[in-house]
Amino acid sequence: MQEMSRRNQHFTDSVIRRMTRISNECGAINLAQGFPDFDPPKEMMDRLEVVSHEGPHQYPITMGAPNFRQAIARKCGHFMGRTIDPETEIVATIGSTEAMVDTLFALTNPGDRVVMLSPFFENYRAQVIMADCEPVFVPLNPPTFSFDPNALEDAFRGGAKAIIICNPSNPSGKVFTEEELKTIADLCIRYDVYAIMDEVYEHIIYDGRKHVYMNSIPGMWERTVSCSSLSKTYSVTGWRLGYAIAPENIMARIRQYHDFNAVGCPSPLMEAAVVGLNMPLSYYDEFGAHYAHMKKIFTEGMRDIGIPFTDPEGTYFVLADISPYLKKGQSDVDFCEQLARKAGVGAVPGSSFFNEPINNIVRLHFAKKDETLYAALDRLNHIKDMM
């Protein structure tokens, strides 16, 4: 038989989803894959129940149902501080993941260099490789996960076509400051580089910090694609509804790839999601307070147990240092498998997020009910005995 594609020789299956499968097999509390165990807003579920009987149930307009795009334009226009045209500057996608893939194909050609900040969400490397591009890594330096502007400029100077930035950052929990984003923006403009922003955690930010949208920085609207989803903000990770926002000339290209990749998003889910997108602004305050509450429970519990970790500025992830618990020669992948099977807690090995050789970090998440978090902390409290 003829040879199959060589592209996926350079990446494996998702470590995050693999850890979910292991957690499910052994009944572990899944703090690996980032999804909540509480319901979406009742208003959205009530609307979905009505839509299940009344429709729509057939193909939508490829770019997304008009009322869905209009609701995105209103909501995002408010937070981004600009008018967004739902007819020419938005496309609905199968989660932010599809938005990122479509964007890479729309902006790059085979062999182009794409800058990524390490640590990074594991999907990015695979997506860049699938687009036949070359990933170029610039480290974020713990514990603040700041970057060296000179190192970033060196990466740009080498001929970068685009940079991928997750803000707030999965897995580090970093929230990029306006000054940091302006530094990146200056380099993007100077070296003619596109900014591909993954902003799915835009409303999960702590301690009075502010999410700054890259496309709001002067000179960046023309070269920025903002990818996001409803998954985190409305606790509907299984609905797989996302979107991209970009200027018309870029959006026209993204829509072409979306059309042939996905045809469209689920019609009944878009209809029900409009209710969420039209929530009053108070919803986002309450949403943020809920996540601050969950963060407090989990981080205080981790401190009491004595497990070192990074305190996130945003997102619902912590990076924990497992150095005290690693056996000699043990990999972080094996540690996480044993943690799920013996301690009953699912985690993600940090090596799947870093380009640098990291073996002592795992990612945990706290988007869970109070009782789930307390149960997980109780199990982690016995980690020394179980491991």
Question: Residue spans of the language-model regions?
Answer:
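Conserved PLP-binding catalytic core of the aspartate aminotransferase-like
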Residues: 291-292, 305-342
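N-terminal small-domain helix-loop-helix segment of the aminotransferase-like
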Residues: 2-95, 102, 278-279, 386-387
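PLP-dependent aminotransferase-like
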Residues: 86, 105-165, 178
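PLP-dependent enzyme catalytic core of the Aspartate aminotransferase-like
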Residues: 74, 115, 154, 328-330, ...
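Helix C-cap/helix->beta junction micro-motif
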Residues: 26, 131, 190-191, 305, ...
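PLP-dependent aminotransferase class I/II
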Residues: 223-314
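A short helix->loop->beta-strand "cap" motif at the edges of active sites that frequently abuts
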Residues: 112, 133, 190-194, 221-222
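Active-site phosphate-binding strand-loop segment of PLP-dependent enzymes
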Residues: 140-207
